Amino acid sequence: MNKNIYALCLLVFLGQNVFAQSNEFEEIIVTATKTEKTLQEVPVAVSVISADEVDKANIVDAFDLMQVVPSLDTRQYQTSRNAAFFIRGFGNGSNNNGVEPSVALFIDGVYRSKMQGRISDLPMVERIEVLRGPQSTLFGKNATAGVINIITKKPSFENFGKLSASLGNYNSRKYKAYYTGPLNDQVAYSFSADTHKADGHAKNTVTGGDTNNRDRYSLRADFLIEAADDLEIRVTADYDEYDEFCCQIGNVSVGPGKQAVYALGAQASPNDPFTDQVHYNFDPIATGENSGITINLVKEMDNMTFTSITSSRDSDSFEYTDIDFDSANMLYNETNVNLSAKSQEFRLASKGNEKFNWLLGAYFYQEDADNDSAVIFAGPAWRAYADILALGATQGAFDMAAVGAALGVPSSLIFATGQGSTGIFTQETDTTSFFGQIDINLSEKLTAILGASYIEDEKKATGVDVNTDIFSQIGLVGAGTIGFIQAGFDPATAAALAANPAVNRLLGFRAFQFLPRMQPFPNVGESGQSKDDNVDYTAKLTYLVNDNISVYGGISTGFKS
């Protein structure tokens, strides 16, 4: 568990980006501070992308936002699920499923904690707000680099429908359907469906298949209930699924190990990270599905507004990947990830007081994550690969069979097909946050903003390693004794070791011991639990120069769990 706090000082002259075409300045309403304000009033570096701009720029998913948002970067890693957002160069990406991103993403106020819940195509949006810099005061943990806040279009009491289709290169086909209208005087609804298919831009020379393709679809139902003049309830259910071959891996350098791959008669990726070819002995499978339901309640009172956002989400993914990334049948990785999350947020916000406006809130988040990941020796090519490297490293002195004989390990048990390591992990996360912010109007043009939040984040994890890789469990340092050398090799080697233990040539084989047996946890030395808490804050001054220009400066902190 890592906890990082950092601050940013901002001084921005009209520092907001609005992607909308108009002949005159348009008043843009945003919820970057969890209350509706004009863009000019918000002392945050924020880019606002309207629904029209989403269509014009052909923004399909959150990753496409980098085309129109300054300082936002997206990166794809080993599988569809392993991707990351970066804002101003800050972010993180990892194949570790327990790692949470540093850029928080919200859809209609609901936090999507892991990348596998973020990769679906966008629904019908009202606008998208990208906030730069730490936003933990109002948005909670893991908003240290910034926030992507997606607001979808509410159902309308006027009938409206939309069909769209687009075709592109790599046989890209995108189809979307949306319809909204009233059920009665108090209930409006909307339904949407979309599908996105495209051939991959990388060709697998072994199977003939495509890699980095697209095969996704999603469904969404939305109901808006105006239960009373002062009470609005919105219920949203969504489902999305992807079934793809991902991802292409390119080499940035070619090391000695690559020559061993060629010696096996196999193909490997060239020294070109931009190659459009891969040489996997099977197509890498990446599948997943996400579903959820959200209830958003807004109650208007005399001097304040009460908001409740309740959500339950589930996410499952499966990956089957050739992790030697060449045509030799050596290693594969199989990963299953299951996530279940529930969240509840309550907010009270004042209404339009001339002197000051305030916001108070509480947030509760609970997530269960199960992750099973296996690295398996896929076939005899792994043993043959190790033999080539062993003979080369010892100038032909011994291969893996000779090492096994000296260690007393039957040759047939070293890197046998089917051996490997399977890690079975669980993680429970409970997060509680209380937050508040007040805007004090010092004059008609000068406003002070003060905010603070308390965040408590508790995690409980378990881990078990089912390991059948015998070679990784051998202590090669201890095995390299004079007695061992005398028993297994020539006297000259024994004499050299006696004079200088550093010449123990067995130590070079530790590179093959990349699957050491993990100690199960919790255990005596590791509780498998962590509990962090932090107080975040923001303090800013904003000055309205005129109707089109504002100046602000301040400091904000962030919390990373």
What are these regions (language model features)?
Residues 224-228, 348-351, 363-365, 429-561:
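Structural signature of Gram-negative outer-membrane beta-barrels, strongest in the C-terminal barrel
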Residues 154, 182-185, 225-231, 300-303, ...:
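Outer-membrane beta-barrel strand-turn architecture
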Residues 202-210, 247-279, 323-332, 374-424, ...:
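Solvent-exposed loop segments that connect transmembrane elements
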Residues 163-167, 191-197, 235-239, 310-312, ...:
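Transmembrane beta-barrel strands of outer-membrane/channel proteins
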Residues 25-158:
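Acidic, small-polar-rich N-terminal luminal/periplasmic segments of exported/outer-membrane proteins
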Residues 83, 100-102, 114, 123-126, ...:
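Outer-membrane beta-barrel translocator/receptor signature
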Residues 149, 156-158, 166, 177-282, ...:
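Periplasmic-side early beta-strands and strand-to-turn transitions of outer-membrane beta-barrels
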